[in-house]
């Protein structure tokens, strides 16, 4: 617990303190957005635009780790009529932080504020349903793969389990893994970092292929993984037309060869966590996530949006799951969420 509190104090508490001790997190953060708060942007590059492909909208899913897990959940709930499911590592329930950085720290990562008030989150979600987001009735029959390691010192297992509780309330079919002795990280067979390791790049090997497991849950039976030279291409593209508060000027998309040639293809959006964007670990997440090898042989396009840090509200380049970019961060009109959705629609 001490390790959990220490790490999340580093990640989120500076954001809360920067806007005052009153706890009025959203108001301060939103004000900064509208008054031109400075951001650290990647150097502009001459890159291709994101291309359009022949997307099979019946097979669109999202995945993420930590803050990326929470953004994935926000996308699923906000666009439940289109997104069929999600895979999450170390995530929390939809709208868990409730526009408050301190709740994010002490309720949705640690447990100092007590258990997650799932019934309150469900009440708020019901009030937003069909107005600020797709109707929650669309969630019935969707799929969620939820992973939380027994050694995770950043996001408590009880938080991940509360996400399962909320998903089940809305009729989402959840498959869970709460028994692996894993620290806080994205589980992939493509790294040698031990399962119990905490720290950058937050990619860990736990002796099984998590991507095979959740991609099968999302899309059905898979062709064999390509363990050789990939026929598809990893493309760095200009994200600037889609970039909102704390989004980088470039991002990545992996496109299998047959998808580039016009075949109808599936899509999964893979969202990195804090300190995992390219400004921290380069292309490690986009090349070692374990997704591209399965995507190459299964007609799956993989979109890797990129977030960046700023010195005031988001020093570790997290996706917005507590309101630093505006109080509507978790619904369809959210600054980052709407831009990621625009990229998905472009594909």
What are these regions (language model features)?
Residues 150-175, 180-182, 197-202, 281-304, ...:
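Active-site-adjacent alpha-helix of alpha/beta-hydrolase-fold enzymes
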Residues 23-46:
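Low-complexity, Pro/Ser/Thr-rich intrinsically disordered segments
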Residues 110-127, 221-262:
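N-terminal cap/lid segment of alpha/beta-hydrolase-fold proteins
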Residues 94-171, 214, 255, 259-261:
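The feature captures the conserved acid-bearing segment of alpha/beta-hydrolase catalytic domains
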Residues 99-108, 192, 196-197, 276-285, ...:
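Cap/lid segment of the alpha/beta-hydrolase catalytic domain
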Residues 263-275:
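Short beta-strand element of the alpha/beta-hydrolase
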Residues 56-103, 223:
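Primarily recognizes the serine-hydrolase "nucleophile elbow" in alpha/beta-hydrolase
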